[in-house]
Amino acid sequence: MDLGPIYNTRDINDGKVINIDNPNYTNPVAIKKNENNNAYQFNHLKTLGLYIQNTTYFTDNFIITGGLRYEYFDQVVGRSTLKNIRSGYLAQKDGKLLYQLGSVYKFTPNIATFFNHAESFRPQNNRTLIINGELPAEQGKSFETGLKYENAYLNATVALFNINKRNVAETVNVNGTNELQIVGKQRSRGIEFDLNGQLTDNLSIAANYTYTKVKNLENHNNKLAVGKQLSGVPKHQASLFLAYNIGEFDFGNIRVGGGARYLGSWYAYNNTYTKAYKLPQAIVYDTFIAYDTKISGKKVSFQLNGKNLSNKVYSPSTSGNASRTLIPVALGYAREVILNTKIEF
């Protein structure tokens, strides 16, 4: 049994932006105090959770796990002036009893099937100018089932999943003012494959493929959104990384590795769902070389990481639904080389 509070305070003040194509770092933009009534956004959130869980072995091959969890939150969210005078805010509290259930059946010592079901209860995170009435917590139900293979060297998993959410909130522009409103329901379903472990004593692998279909099931604000894929979620994602341990030498141990990540294409929409932009697919290559040794009897590790070796311009995500005309697109990092050093005392 676990009992514990979490308290989080966050204050945000929007400042000016710089030109990403021609940034000027030597003459930074002066940050001025904002005296407007709605200049500062705050979100004071307290959450409390209490759960109990039990695992039962019906046989050596059949295992069931069940649990109950009570989630409670106390939230004050809104906007304020520089002197912390609240110009518009919402105070609400709520709680819900959730349950989860899981099972595992082993066909052989190496092969098993599994099933999991869980519920979620999450308070809304408001960052808009106006709070339009109470914002009930987002609630979800998830189901997952699949097969798992595991031996002394490798483990592989294939799983089907389905996640339904309701009380989904969205920023809605009302007469030129952004409001956070409950708009409806969303669903995410797909299949995932994972492979991890040792191919040989020196060669390891980490591979993953995910197909995800995420769409709006219901949207009270805009009927055009129904059936559309959610922004920022490519249908196809995959990665493959290999690492090879070259071996021990008089001066230390050397490991090298590398691989690629694949992001499929997807559509991003403006807030009226009348305009769309197709984000192109991308393959990004990463690599590393690591060296472990001892200096004065202390373990020392050096690792040189190279990310996005081909300097590919790509988008890992989109914000989505920003305005009638703009579709914000986040850019992935450019080619990056990082050297990390660790000393164990």
Swiss-Prot record:
**Where does this polypeptide localize?**
Cell outer membrane
Q: Which GO terms describe its cellular component?
A: cell outer membrane
| InterPro entries referenced in this protein's UniProt entry, alphabetically | TonB-dep_rcpt-like, TonB-dep_rcpt_b-brl, TonB_rcpt_b-brl_sf
* Organism name: Haemophilus influenzae (strain ATCC 51907 / DSM 11121 / KW20 / Rd)
UniProt cross-references to PANTHER family, sorted A to Z: BLL7968 PROTEIN, FERRICHROME IRON RECEPTOR-RELATED
Keyword annotations of the record: Cell outer membrane, Membrane, Receptor, TonB box, Transmembrane, Transmembrane beta strand, Transport
Q: Which family does it belong to?
A: Belongs to the TonB-dependent receptor family.
**TBDR plug domain segment(s):** 1
Keyword Disulfide bond assigned: no
What's the protein here called? Uncharacterized TonB-dependent receptor HI_1466.1
Cross-referenced PROSITE patterns:
TONB_DEPENDENT_REC_3
Which topology term describes how it sits in the membrane?
Answer: Multi-pass membrane protein
The residues covered by the TBDR beta-barrel domain are 1-345
Map motif TonB C-terminal box onto the chain.
Answer: 328-345
